[in-house]
Swiss-Prot record:
The keyword ATP-binding does not apply. The target of rapamycin complex 2 (TORC2) is composed of at least AVO1, AVO2, BIT61, LST8, TOR2 and TSC11. TORC2 forms a homodimer. Contrary to TORC1, TORC2 does not bind to and is not sensitive to FKBP-rapamycin. TSC11 binds to the N-terminal HEAT repeat region in TOR2 and is required for TORC2 integrity by tethering AVO1 and AVO2 to the complex. Residues 1-62, 182-285 are annotated as: Disordered. Residues 7-26, 35-44, 233-265 have a biased composition (Polar residues). It comes from Saccharomyces cerevisiae (strain ATCC 204508 / S288c) (Baker's yeast). Belongs to the RICTOR family. This is Target of rapamycin complex 2 subunit TSC11. The modification Phosphoserine is found at residues 19, 81, 84, 87, 141. Residues 45-57 have a biased composition (Low complexity). GO terms for molecular function: guanyl-nucleotide exchange factor activity; molecular adaptor activity; protein-membrane adaptor activity. SUPFAM superfamilies: ARM repeat. It comes from the Eukaryota.
Length: 1430
């Protein structure tokens, strides 16, 4: 297939040459794409005529004779290719009506195909979204995530049905259009053939013309040229200059590309027909500006031709940088749009052109070359070919340049990053160049180079280690001013320590104590930089909150951590250390705010450990144990015992110490920790200090309980106890005298002003004495006490009904009113009072009914009164009346239920508000009306009402389940009511509103989790199980953990399907979810739970399964435990546990560990683990796994196993300590007795038994003798001398005064294999090598020795002076020959030089001129032909 090209017309300015005006480049920068008219090049470069001789008439003719530019199109046309018109005007031929109809049909078919592709893509996206919601792993506490996913599945299924219908419609429409197209095509065959012949003859005539030279002026490249990742942007030039040559593209394009570019193929539905349109489908070329646009639908074949043309244009010499930049932009854009053509190109034929571009001194041209190479890379093989072309040397030279070459250096670094993607091509020399960029503070590419270096730590850790890259990275951690950068580096280092692959190279090079240098410098500085101290504290806290972080701080018997806590002796550092450990122990977050503002207000808050998941507390217990072994308490006590103490600092220290002891007692062991040294000061007694500790301890523990006792509700117990005492005392022990005294003290009889009444005494009377039949009757007959209370609560008296919500005793009025109606309905005398009263209930019924009718004038039930007054209290009174048969009788007598039914009409907003206030107060036990009302509210159209009714049913069900009835009749009634409420609640699972479903689902979940479930519940669940499975409710897992629930779920095949799902994918998904959960809970802020339930790990299928005997039986029959066991034992017994880091194997191992852990966390499952000795294998993983996350997964799993007594016994036998509660019950925390084994990396084992004890010599002050015999400290003198030599001569070069070794190879400099042939064959004709005399080797040795001295900052100044003198004497003959190039190049690759030294060496030795000699030598050595294939 060929690209249509234009023939050229003769210009009136010259009869010998053709003038061709240039169009805008084929691929232009974004900012240069405009619609400006194409400039016409001047004729002064073609003829001797001046521009003034050109007449207006000739100019017009020139504009009319504009032709397409062919600077990038070959004049040779492939066979069977369609000819192009001789000019844009010739393409404007009249089309027939049939041709237009075919074109319109073709366009419409294409549009329909695009629409079909769009619909199918949309369908795929929706299916992917729907499939992502299928897998549900429930969180430990209730959430509505499963309902959100359920709603997403429903929406996705609805959208899929609609899209399927749309796809069918589009396919039918395409079929109809193709039928029309086929019919019209048959009638137009003759016409199309004639048109094709006519156009072909015209193009064949034009095809004989030759290509003409494009002329134009270029704007010069300015220094402000910038380069982004999309284009090399240059100022837009009017024309471009191409060499006058015929391009032969047959060498770079496969023969299979010989197809017609202008042929349109439209497949039929059956795939058998193909429509060919030639001339009639060509684009109208009438307007020249239309040709200046980028080809938007370039075919693969045409793109291949254009790539070849771009590459040919790079071979031209002495071209303007703008031209190269625009061609590079075009080539890159083409490669982006047609990446498939890369494999069809033979690139070796023009890679020499890339070399020439890189050798060009212009930064824009070099940047263009880098960018083109970057987009041509598609394999490691091609990268190897680039390295053979010395691309690594080019990159090193570019990176050594200053910031004025930003555009070139940026592209060179991006080229390195492209190498990283293929894990190939990054040499040691490139690594040193990147490190040099990182070391230079003023380098504009410093952060980009640092990012690259951090990536190389994962890709090529060994090379980074050889180049001592970690030392450079460590330097950024000491620059606390850039906290965001330091935190990223710290996170990267911690990740490097996570696996053996990278850890083995950096563990010895990285010293975690570098984070504490800011504290070390505090003693030597008068002023403390608060921002640096806060940033350092935050970094230390981040480190200690990560697994690898506290393993690094625990290294060498906790030596780094001991160094850290020793800074408690410095008061300035102590305040920051306290903040750090408060954060690490999850007591209180760091108080630092942005911009270094410190929060000086100190408010102690209690730790929330008792609300946390036990796995989170297990990690916290480990940190407490680490601090216990790091002399944390003694150093903190020394701070509190300072003579000159800061009271604020001491208060924080007490707070930290108190909370630390609390955590230690609850999470580590139940023994109290004794303080060895009492805190004492002359005027600050031991008793006072004890009082301060007691005060803060009481304050912290006031609202929390010891672990194991948290289930005891002391407040509720006290309330129940006081209530019973009050009832018994008031009922039995109140005599007549005291009763009369209480009535008198209430002041109800003395005054009608209710604000002066003693409402507490009134409430005591209603709760006690007035429940006595005799006393109530006496009070009614002899006083107006009851009457005045009735009058107070009558709506139309405007006493109670006129009290504001914000009044002092407003809630007391409501509370006493509820007790008043409860007391009256409890006795016959009270019922008589209510039956005789014709005011309160009738007025309420009348006022509410009138309000719903719209009569709110003078009515207390209106919108404003409901908002401002305590009118809601009347609805509570109605609820009290529904709680007894007598109360229901009162409501029935005054037809109050009719008023409630009226509320459902929703004729006014007041009716809805009344209903929302009434529903929560109704009791369902005594009135069928109430049950009907609630049933109606559950299905009413208004969503708010349904939510409120569903919530009310759930609350009443939990309340009913918590009560116990001893009477058989009452028990039977309770079961019936329970079934009714359960049925009503489970029906709500079918509601169309997700909010209603969520309320019902949560209520059912809470009922089961609370442990109040029974087989009666299971019977009620039976008919709704399928719906629960449909919405994927977490109730299913709670049911699965109960015997009756397992049977129900097994009947509907849920257990088998869920098991298959977990084995296939959910076990792996659980690993990611639980790790995210544990990471999220590293933060201090405790999550507020929606109901009283302790935080738990995400629910696991095998945990619920193994809580029943049926589940254990199923587990044994299926062999799942054996499968998990095999995965673990394969890892443990594979003899490569210390190095296995395959991602899939590690993920499978973690999944198996969690499964085994949850099986072992149950009373029935732990026996299975003991049978297979799995606990021992898990401990082995915890001690020796190479991947840190695997080690801590085993740690958490052992904590799960310790949740049973039998599990604790097994772990105790194997050297792990299990924590128990005050009731001697396991709490699920297991800690290793050998912390050194658990916290040691396999690459650096350490022991806590004396191997790293500090040698101390202690003298007796009286006689000067040694107190105890200590071994003398031995010094390794050879090692000290070696370190001294290394410091003075880091390059390890032999220093010989006034003498230089003639043999450079005898030094530590080595020559790579690829350059060895250069030294072995010096007989090649070289402009410099052949001129050497015998003494030249000694000069080279001298130069290289001087170069080695440049690495020593003491000798560098003299070396620069000396090498400059040699350069002035010998010049390029010595400094730019290829032999010296490679020797200096290898030295720069092997040794570290400062950035300014590297720039100096590159200017002398590693420059373009020397590199050009090397490339010339390579070409002669290889005798490479001009074109060859790989």
């Amino acid at each position: 297939m060929s690209i249509p090209h234009s023939a050229k017309q003769s210009s009136p300015l010259s009869s010998r040459r053709r003038s061709v005006t240039n169009t805008t480049p084929l691929l232009t920068p974004r900012h240069s794409r405009d619609n400006s008219s194409t400039q016409i090049s001047s004729a002064k470069n073609i003829t001797s005529s001046s521009p003034s001789t050109i007449t207006n008439e000739s100019s017009k003719r020139n504009k009319q004779n504009l032709v397409l530019s062919t600077s990038f199109i070959s004049t040779k046309r492939l066979e069977n290719s369609a000819p192009s018109p001789t000019s844009p005007l010739m393409a404007r031929r009249t089309r027939s009506t049939m041709t237009k109809a075919l074109l319109n049909l073709k366009a419409e078919i294409n549009n329909q195909y695009q629409e079909l592709a769009r619909l199918r893509k949309k369908k795929d996206d929706i299916e992917h979204l729907r499939d992502s919601t299928i897998s549900d792993i429930y969180s430990g506490s209730y959430s509505t995530n499963h309902l959100q996913k359920h709603s997403m599945r429903i929406r996705a299924n609805t959208q899929l049905r609609e899209i399927d219908n749309s796809i069918k419609r589009v396919e039918k429409h395409i079929f109809d259009l193709k039928q029309q197209f086929d019919k019209k095509r048959q009638r137009s065959l003759t016409t199309s053939s004639s048109i094709k012949a006519d156009v072909g003859s015209i193009r064949n005539d034009d095809g004989q013309n030759n290509d003409s030279e494009e002329l134009g002026d270029h704007d010069s490249l300015t220094d402000q040229v910038t380069l982004d990742d999309e284009y090399l942007t240059t100022p837009t030039s009017g024309t471009e200059r191409n060499s006058q040559q015929n391009l032969n593209r047959n060498s770079t394009v496969n023969s299979r590309n010989n197809e017609n570019h202008s042929t349109l193929s439209i497949p039929d539905l059956d795939g058998s027909n193909k429509v060919n349109l030639t001339g009639d489908t060509e684009k109208d070329l009438g307007d020249l500006e239309n040709e200046n646009q980028i080809f938007t639908s370039t075919t693969t074949e045409a793109a291949t031709w254009l790539v070849s043309d771009y590459m040919q244009s790079f071979q031209e010499k002495n071209v303007n940088p703008d031209f190269i930049a625009q061609k590079a932009n075009g080539l890159v854009t083409l490669l982006k749009e047609h990446s498939e053509i890369r494999k069809d190109l033979v690139l070796t034929s023009f890679m020499s052109s890339i070399q020439n571009l890189l050798l060009n001194g212009n930064k824009l041209i070099a940047a263009s070359a880098y960018r083109v190479c970057r987009y041509l890379i598609n394999s490691s093989i091609f990268i190897d070919e680039l390295l053979e072309l010395r691309l690594d040397a080019f990159i090193i030279i570019s990176l050594a340049k200053d910031n004025s070459f930003q555009i070139e250096r940026e592209q060179a670094l991006k080229m390195v990053r492209r190498f990283i993607e293929y894990n190939n091509g990054v040499t040691q020399g490139i690594m040193q160049a990147i490190i040099s960029c990182v070391e230079k503070p003023e380098d504009s590419l410093r952060h980009m180079a640092l990012e690259t270096l951090l990536e190389l730590c994962f890709v090529a850790p060994e090379m980074v280690k050889e180049c001592r890259g970690m030392r450079v990275i460590e330097g950024f951690l000491q620059d606390y001013t850039s906290f965001s950068l330091a935190s990223v580096i710290l996170d990267t280092i911690l990740q490097l320590m996570a696996t053996h692959k990278t850890r083995q190279h950096f563990l010895e090079d990285f010293n975690v104590s570098v984070l504490t240098t800011v504290f070390s410098d505090t003693n030597t500085k008068s002023n403390v930089n608060v921002e640096k101290m806060q940033n350092a504290s935050t970094l230390i806290s981040i480190t200690l909150n990560s697994y690898n972080g506290f393993m690094l701080f625990s290294n060498n018997n906790f030596k780094p951590l001991k160094q850290l806590v020793s800074f408690f002796q410095i008061p300035i550092c102590a305040q920051y250390l306290i903040d750090i450990f408060l954060d690490v122990l999850k007591i209180k977050p760091l108080p630092y705010k942005p911009r270094g503002r410190h929060s000086h207000s100190f408010k102690p808050i209690p730790s929330q450990y008792y609300k946390e998941c036990m796995s989170v507390n297990q990690r916290l217990a480990l940190i407490v144990l680490i601090l216990e072994n790091s002399e944390f308490v003694p150093h903190l006590l020394e701070l509190l015992n300072e003579e000159d103490r800061d009271d604020h600092l001491v208060a924080k220290g007490r707070y930290l110490l108190t909370e630390y002891f609390n955590l230690r007692m609850n999470l580590v062991d139940k023994k109290y920790t004794s303080v060895s040294k009492p805190i004492y000061k002359e005027n600050f007694t031991y008793v006072n200090e004890t009082f301060q500790f007691k005060k803060i301890a009481y304050k912290m523990n006031r609202n929390r309980n010891t672990i194991g006792m948290s289930g005891i509700d002391y407040a509720q117990n006290i309330k129940s106890f006081s209530k019973n005492i009050k009832e018994n005392t008031l009922l039995r022990e109140v005599d007549d005298f005291r009763f009369r005294r209480m009535v008198y003290d209430s002041k109800v009889l003395q005054t009608k002003d209710f604000t002066r009444w003693n409402w507490n005494i009134i409430n005591e009377l209603l709760e006690g004495p007035l429940l006595n039949k005799k006393q109530l009757e006496e009070l009614v007959k002899s006083t107006k006490f009851i009457r005045r209370l009735l009058v107070f609560y009558r709506p139309l008296r405007l006493r109670f009904s006129n009290v504001n919500k914000g009044a002092k005793l407003s809630q007391k009025y409501v509370q006493v009113g509820c007790q008043f109606f409860k007391t009256l309905t409890a006795t016959p005398e009270g019922m008589k009072i209510l039956m005789d009263d014709t005011k309160i209930i009738p007025q309420l019924a009348s006022l509410m009914f009138r309000a719903m009718e719209g009569n709110i004038s003078g009515n207390i039930f209106n919108k404003n009164k409901l908002r401002e007054k305590i009118i809601f209290g009347y609805f509570k009174f109605i609820g009290i009346l529904t709680q007894s048969k007598n109360g229901v009788h009162i409501l029935t007598r005054w037809n109050f239920f009719t008023v409630i039914y009226k509320m459902f009409q929703f004729e006014s907003k007041l009716g809805l508000e009344f209903l929302l206030l009434t529903i929560p107060e109704l009791d369902l036990k005594y009135s069928s009306h109430c049950r009907v009302i609630i049933g109606k509210a559950l299905v009413v159209a208004n969503e708010k009402v349904r939510i409120e009714a569903t919530k009310h049913i759930g609350d009443k069900l939990k309340e009913l389940l918590s009560t116990k009835e001893s009477d058989l009749k009452l028990k039977a009634n309770k079961v019936k009511l329970q079934q009714f409420k359960m049925e009503m609640l489970t029906r709500q699972l079918y509601d169309l509103s997700p909010s209603v479903v969520a309320v019902a689902d949560q209520a059912l979940y809470e009922c089961i989790v609370a442990g109040n479930g029974s087989e009666e519940l299971g019977t009620s669940f039976r008919m709704f199980l399928n719906q629960m499975v449909f919405i994927r409710s977490p109730i299913l897992f709670e049911l699965l953990s109960r015997p009756y629930g397992f049977q129900l779920l097994n009947e509907i095949n849920f257990v088998k399907e869920e098991r298959d799902s977990w084995l296939s994918k959910k076990n792996i998904e659980y690993v990611h979810i639980v790790e995210e959960f544990l990471k999220k809970n590293e933060s201090i802020n405790a999550k507020s739970l929606t109901f009283q339930q302790k935080s738990r790990l995400p629910l696991h299928f095998y945990e619920s399964l193994t809580k029943t005997e049926d589940g254990i039986l199923l587990l044994s029959q299926t062999g799942d435990l054996v499968t998990f066991m095999n995965v673990i034992k394969k890892y443990v017994n594979g003899n490569n546990m210390a190095t296995v880091e395959n991602a899939k194997e590690i993920l499978d191992l973690k999944a198996a560990l969690w499964c085994v852990g949850f099986i072992g966390s149950t009373e029935l499952g732990i026996g299975l683990l003991d049978n297979y000795s799995l606990v021992e294998d898990i401990i082995e993983v915890a001690y020796n796994a190479s991947v840190t996350s695997v080690r801590f997964t085993a740690f958490y799993v052992l904590g799960l196993i310790s949740m049973t007594r039998e599990g604790c016994e097994i772990l105790d036998e194997m050297g792990w300590n299990c924590c128990v509660s005050v009731q001697d019950e396991p709490i699920g925390i297991a800690l290793p007795n050998r912390l050194d084994r658990f916290l040691s990396y396999n690459e650096h084992k350490w022991s806590a038994f004396g191997e790293y004890s500090d040698e101390m010599i202690v003298f007796n002050k009286s006689d000067g003798d040694l107190i105890e015999k200590c071994l003398p400290i031995e010094f390794d003198l050879d090692k000290l001398l070696k370190e001294k030599d290394t410091a003075e001569n880091p390059l390890n070069e032999k220093i010989i005064t006034n003498k230089y070794d003639n043999d450079i190879t005898s030094q530590t400099i080595t020559v790579s294999g690829e350059n060895s042939s250069l030294f072995a064959n010096e007989g090649l004709s070289s402009p410099y090598v052949t001129q050497y005399r015998n003494d030249d080797d000694s000069i080279e040795s001298k130069v290289l020795h001087i170069v080695s001295q440049l690495g020593n900052h003491i000798l560098s100044n003299h070396a620069v002076k000396e090498i400059t003198e040699i350069n002035n004497k010998y010049g390029p003959r010595l400094f730019e020959n290829e032999k010296m190039f490679f020797k200096v190049f290898n030295m720069m690759s092997k040794y570290r030089f400062k950035p300014h030294v590297r720039k100096f060496l590159c200017g002398l030795f590693i420059n373009n001129r020397a590199l050009e000699n090397v490339i010339r030598h390579d070409n002669k050595r290889d005798k490479r032909p001009a074109n060859f294939t790989r």
